[in-house]
Amino acid sequence: MANNLGLVILLLVIVLVSCSKSSDCALASPQKSRPSSEWRRKLIPVRSSRSPRSPSFAPKKPPPPPPSPPLSPSSPPSN
């Protein structure tokens, strides 16, 4: 079993090495590689909303505590 596994791995390595050196390999992708500027044009530009210059980058202050309601004198419970 280990012998067969070693042969399979060796065969895969040979195929990959020979494929990487030849340009018309059956395992190679049929598409031509695109120039780097072409795929960069397809990227969507994303603007960061948290840049150091924007005010949203500063740490947010915690909201002020709500004003406490006036204390009303507690009336004794009536039964």
Curated annotation (Swiss-Prot):
Cellular component aspect of the GO annotation: apoplast; plasma membrane
Compartments, record wording: Cell membrane; Secreted, Extracellular space, Apoplast
Signal peptide: 1-19
Motif SCOOP motif: where in chain: 45-57
Stretches with biased composition (Low complexity): 45-59
Entry GO MF terms: LRR domain binding; receptor serine/threonine kinase binding
Region described as Disordered: spans on this chain: 25-79
Extent of Pro residues compositional bias: 60-79
GO BP term, example: response to insect
Entry annotated with the keyword Signal: yes
Motif placement: SxS motif essential for MIK2 binding: 49-51
Principal location class: membrane
Keyword annotations of the record: Apoplast, Cell membrane, Cleavage on pair of basic residues, Membrane, Secreted, Signal
Origin: domain of life: Eukaryota
Function: Brassicaceae-specific phytocytokine (plant endogenous peptide released into the apoplast) perceived by MIK2 in a BAK1/SERK3 and SERK4 coreceptors-dependent manner, that modulates various physiological and antimicrobial processes including growth prevention and reactive oxygen species (ROS) response regulation.
Assigned protein family: Belongs to the serine rich endogenous peptide (SCOOP) phytocytokine family.
Complex formation: Interacts with MIK2 (via extracellular leucine-rich repeat domain); this interaction triggers the formation of complex between MIK2 and the BAK1/SERK3 and SERK4 coreceptors, and subsequent BAK1 activation by phosphorylation.
Protein name: Serine rich endogenous peptide 2
Organism expressing this protein natively: Arabidopsis thaliana
